[in-house]
A protein has these predicted regions:
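ATP-dependent small-molecule kinase phosphotransfer cores
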Residues: 1-35, 41-45
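Conserved AAA+ ATPase "sensor/coupling" helix adjacent to the nucleotide-binding pocket
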Residues: 4-8, 70-77, 118-121
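Conserved catalytic network of the ASCE P-loop NTPase/AAA+ motor domain
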Residues: 27-30, 48-52, 94-96
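Conserved phosphate-donor/acceptor-positioning beta-strand/loop module used by diverse small-molecule
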Residues: 35-40, 49-74, 105
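Phosphate- and divalent-cation-binding pockets in alpha/beta enzyme and binding domains
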Residues: 46, 66, 110
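NTP-dependent small-molecule kinase module
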Residues: 53, 76-77, 91-140
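Glycine-rich S-adenosyl-L-methionine
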Residues: 79-88
């Protein structure tokens, strides 16, 4: 699929290949759905190139120390893997200005509320709306 350009984006992350099939993404968008993708900075860059109208949100922990504590708390990664993830996080954090929005995840509920607010605001952008008023001519 990768060689046939069937992915909207793809990346190798922590030794694993991930990708978003373009057909599935475009089908969901064509049905008017909001689509959320959990992708790295390389995938986000690919999406912006292929879909310039895409909205990007960078979500990060309040600090690298907090991220490390969360990774250790999960108790699912070996110390070497945690070290690798922290190094990758440093690289990704450096790219935060390439995104449309930034959420600092201090509290899960607050982060979810902020993401919901972004989605709602984006739905209201005039460039995304098609209005039909029977008594008013609205130029397109």
């Amino acid at each position: 699929m990768r060689n046939r350009d069937e992915f909207a984006e793809w990346a190798e992350v922590h030794g694993h290949l991930y990708g978003t099939p373009a057909r599935a993404l475009e089908g969901a968008l064509g049905r008017g759905l909001d689509v959320l993708l959990d992708i790295d900075t390389h995938g986000a860059r690919q999406l912006r190139q292929r879909y310039p109208e895409a909205v990007s949100v960078f979500i990060m922990a309040p600090s690298l120390a907090e991220l490390e504590a969360r990774l250790r708390e999960r108790n699912s990664d070996a110390p070497r893997e945690i070290h690798r993830r922290l190094a990758r996080a440093r690289e990704e954090i450096a790219a935060w200005r390439q995104y449309d929005y930034l959420i600092i995840n201090r509290d899960v509920k607050e982060a979810v509320d902020q993401l919901a607010a972004i989605i709602q605001a984006e739905r209201c952008r005039t460039g995304r709306l098609t209005l039909k008023f029977p008594d008013v001519e609205v130029p397109e």
